[in-house]
Swiss-Prot record:
Pfam families: GCHY-1
Gene Ontology MF, one: GTP cyclohydrolase I activity
EC code(s) of this entry: 3.5.4.16
Keyword terms, alphabetized: Hydrolase
Catalyzed reactions per annotation: GTP + H2O = 7,8-dihydroneopterin 3'-triphosphate + formate + H(+)
Protein name stated in the entry: GTP cyclohydrolase FolE2
InterPro entries reported in the protein's UniProt record: GTP_cyclohydrolase_FolE2, GTP_cyclohydrolase_FolE2/MptA
Domain of life: Bacteria
HAMAP family in the cross-refs: GTP_cyclohydrol_B
Family as reported in the entry's similarity comment: Belongs to the GTP cyclohydrolase IV family.
Gene Ontology terms describing biological process: tetrahydrofolate biosynthetic process
């Protein structure tokens, strides 16, 4: 066994690099960590998030200190919100002695929903991503991305068929760059209200009849969904920029239908 000595251990990451090439993003990816996320009902949800954490690296340094990313994450075990997300990002940039940083936090988020007729309650899960970025030492930007599962029913199929119409589950993905607070639930409702019908975790027979007929009476192409969502986002002053996507997992094809609208309202 080697004896312990007081001699300093070499800091290889902090040594100079002679290639003179800066790195835009370096850090850790796909690390899981338990978090508390605030919900609109005044409570909080215990969940597990997957983090990607990066900083930029100047051309004159060989490497970054990977262990510090984990230390920063472990030091923030309290409730994570839009506001505290900025604090974590600034802490990372400061600790890693960088002027730019990027954090992505992806987690399942649950909403307790009531069935439309019976009122029976059940949970439905959504995939949410918080994205925070600091550029040039001070410029902070926050984006929230929510993937909302919905039902879409084809207008063409309804029009040309003597009875019935093909329908399928779809994903409406909304990414919003905000200037003030927006609840996750607010984004979910925007997507669900513009679909042919929303989804529920549990339905009784009267509920199933209702959602089937609602979708049939509200047919939407992917083009309709993204345009209808974009129209709502265009009139929401809390949102500076957005990307809205719709992907229909076609029930009569072995491919998806897809549409996207991207707008920066500041330009």
């Amino acid at each position: 066994m080697k004896k312990h000595t007081d001699q300093p251990i070499a800091d290889v990451q902090g040594s100079p690099d002679t290639r003179h090439i800066a790195i835009d993003r370096v850090g850790i990816k796909a690390i899981r960590h338990p978090v508390l996320v605030a919900d609109k009902d005044g409570g909080s949800q215990h969940t597990v998030a997957q983090f990607n954490m990066y900083v930029n690296l100047p051309h004159n340094f060989k490497g970054t200190h990977m262990s510090r990313f984990v230390e920063i994450l472990n030091s923030h075990e309290r409730e994570i919100s839009v506001e505290s997300f900025e604090e974590i990002l600034r802490s990372m940039v400061s600790r890693l002695e960088s002027d730019s940083g990027h954090i992505e936090m992806t987690f399942p988020y649950f909403v307790n929903k009531s069935a439309p007729i019976s009122g029976v309650k059940s949970l439905l899960d959504y995939e949410v991503t918080f994205i925070g970025e600091i550029k040039h030492g001070d410029q902070y930007g926050f984006t929230m991305k929510v993937i909302v599962p919905v039902t879409s029913l084809c207008p063409c199929s309804k029009k040309i068929s003597d009875y019935g119409a093909h329908n399928q589950r779809s994903h409406v993905t909304i990414s919003v760059h905000t200037n003030s607070f927006v609840w996750i639930e607010d984004v979910i409702r925007i997507a669900e209200e513009q679909a042919s019908c929303e989804l529920f975790g549990l339905l009784k027979r009267p509920d199933e009849k209702y959602v089937t007929e609602k979708a049939y009476n509200n047919p939407k192409f992917v083009e309709d969904i993204v345009r209808d969502v974009a129209e709502i986002l265009n009139h929401d002053d809390r949102i500076d920029a957005y990307v809205v996507e719709s992907e229909n997992f076609e029930s009569i094809h072995n491919h998806s239908a897809y549409a996207l609208i991207e707008r920066d309202k500041r330009k």
